[in-house]
């Protein structure tokens, strides 16, 4: 569900910033949910995307396809509807793309180490991004004609449009070398 700015603000205002944020324990990537909810409530969208990116490589995907166990863990869920955390995450990343806040973070401290990542699914892309950001030269090897792995070939378009994968490829191509044309030559089908 895509939220307008006002709807996102209303959902963010519902977050109680619990002493023990059960929503965070429900989140598989440990997003700092109360913080970005508050930032959306105060309409500080730039800080909200910074907080979200501090724990989540690809909110473009999780904001659309995650089953949202954070919402099941939300304290409000006891006697009311949970905060719409997944929809807030979706709104944050969409606002970040609209304002060109999703940019490559090229490391200035190069290590000189070359690393190959086999496969460009979500795990491969996240590993490549993290390794590139600490200064390694990273090449992603992909046997298919386009990057994305399960994101591209396993998730139907009505769940997540593939344009989000293509946008990321353009932005992060300065961080990560795309070697999708390379194949393993020893006969191994990876």
Predicted segments — roles?
Residues 1, 30-42, 47-52, 56, ...:
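Beta1-alpha1 glycine-rich phosphate/pyrophosphate-binding loop at the start
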Residues 1-114, 162, 167:
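Ferredoxin-type iron-sulfur electron-transfer modules and their immediate structural context
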Residues 116-118:
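Conserved beta-strand elements of the Class I
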Residues 188-190:
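Core beta-strand elements of the Rossmann-like FAD/NAD(P) dinucleotide-binding domain
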């Amino acid at each position: 569900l895509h939220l307008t700015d006002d709807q996102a603000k209303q959902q963010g205002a519902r977050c109680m910033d619990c002493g023990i944020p059960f929503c965070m324990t429900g989140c598989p990537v440990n997003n700092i949910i109360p913080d970005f909810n508050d930032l959306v409530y105060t309409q500080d969208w730039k800080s909200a995307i910074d907080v979200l990116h501090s724990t989540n490589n690809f909110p473009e995907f999780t904001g659309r396809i995650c089953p949202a166990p954070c919402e099941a863990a939300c304290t409000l869920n006891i006697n009311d509807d949970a905060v719409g955390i997944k929809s807030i995450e979706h709104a944050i990343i969409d606002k970040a793309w609209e304002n060109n806040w999703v940019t490559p973070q090229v490391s200035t401290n190069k290590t000189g180490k070359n690393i190959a990542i086999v496969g460009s699914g979500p795990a491969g892309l996240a590993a490549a991004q993290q390794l590139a950001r600490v200064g390694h030269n990273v090449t992603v090897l992909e046997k298919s004609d386009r990057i994305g792995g399960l994101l591209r070939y396993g998730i139907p378009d009505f769940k997540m449009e593939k344009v989000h994968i293509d946008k990321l490829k353009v932005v992060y191509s300065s961080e990560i070398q795309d070697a999708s044309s390379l194949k393993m030559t020893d006969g191994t089908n990876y």
